[in-house]
Amino acid sequence: MADSLDRLYQAVLAARDLDPATSRTARLFQRGSGKMAKKLAEEAIEVVIDAVNGNREAVIRESADLLYNLTVLWASAGVRPEDVWAEMRRRENLLGIAEKLPKSRIGKPAAPHATRRPVIPQEARAVRKHR
């Protein structure tokens, strides 16, 4: 599956600069991350509704749409599939592949992407009071 998502990611990158009049992907990039997030949320809700209704075939179709929209949002945010796979490996090493990390952090966070600002824990931030 990772190969399929990697190919999809590359196709999304290739399509982002196409004509928005003919490319759904280019149109999403033109409209921005807010529209991308809305489409992702819509697809997630459709997957949930179809799953609750027991419609297996619709869950499969809507899941493909969900993964497409997630991949578009990743590309917009500068997140590569391998970044996500690295985080999944880290979590698997901590808790096993089938577990979600608790909200309190366990272990080191994933290494930040080279172009991002470093994450500074809240407790390490100095608070300045203006007089």
Swiss-Prot record:
Which family is this sequence assigned to? Belongs to the PRA-PH family.
* Gene Ontology biological process: L-histidine biosynthetic process
Give the EC number: 3.6.1.31
**This protein's name:** Phosphoribosyl-ATP pyrophosphatase 2
Q: What is its main location?
A: cytoplasm
**GO MF terms, alphabetically ordered:** ATP binding; phosphoribosyl-ATP diphosphatase activity
Cellular-component GO terms for this entry? cytoplasm
Q: What is the lineage of its organism?
A: Bacteria, Pseudomonadati, Pseudomonadota, Alphaproteobacteria, Hyphomicrobiales
Species for this entry: Rhodopseudomonas palustris (strain ATCC BAA-98 / CGA009)
Region of interest (Disordered), residue spans: 105-131
**What's in the keyword line of the UniProt record?**
Amino-acid biosynthesis, ATP-binding, Cytoplasm, Histidine biosynthesis, Hydrolase, Nucleotide-binding
Recorded catalytic activity of this chain's protein: 1-(5-phospho-beta-D-ribosyl)-ATP + H2O = 1-(5-phospho-beta-D-ribosyl)-5'-AMP + diphosphate + H(+)
**Lipid biosynthesis listed as a keyword:** no
- Which InterPro entries does the record cross-reference, listed alphabetically? HisE, PRib-ATP_PPHydrolase-like
